[in-house]
Amino acid sequence: MSTEMIVVPASHADVGDIVSLVNSAYRGEGAGWTNEVGLLAGPRTDPATLAEVLAAEKGTMLLMREKDGAQLAGCVALEPAGEAATWHLAMLTVDPRRQAEGLGRALLSKAEDYVRRQGAARVQMTVISLRHSLIAWYERRGYRRTGASEPFPYGDDRVGVPLRDDLHFVVLEKPCRWGRRDGPARLRAKSLQIE
């Protein structure tokens, strides 16, 4: 029996569920294979910050849910960046109990499809430089380090409490193009169907 998943735009009614999902995946006890435990403490996001994301004139947050709409399995935020035809991807999250099912890969593919349809030439993201396994995961999906880095926003409570003084972000980028390798994901996960 398979669990069908759908990807839909988030609404303000979803804020509470998204906050719980993101905080459990990034900082929760028993968090999944990749998290920020040991790097940052406190919540990863809060209702006010997510409400701002959803109220933004441009961009979107996509949610991955079971088809019946009951269970939120993942989310990702997307917004146009300052450069023409560049979109920023952030907060890619999968419920820690559902990781290793191919959901993150599928949601990333849907996010890339979305920005392609918006005319994006590239997708960029920032990742904490010490999250080596996460950076490697993105690199296996075609993202490359640009060589640029950005300072960590020490003192900004919206991102949590830093536990180290050597945090900074690396910038990853992937060109947006349709093709056999970069087109919509053909998932091999046993129990996953994406509409």
Each PLM stretch: what is its role?
Residues 4-6:
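Extreme N-terminal starter segment of soluble prokaryotic enzymes
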Residues 9-15, 19-97, 108-110, 114, ...:
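Acetyl-CoA-dependent GNAT
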Residues 71, 91, 95-109, 116-118, ...:
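Conserved glycine-rich acetyl-CoA-binding loop
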Residues 82, 104, 165:
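Short, conserved glycine- and acidic-residue-centered signature motifs
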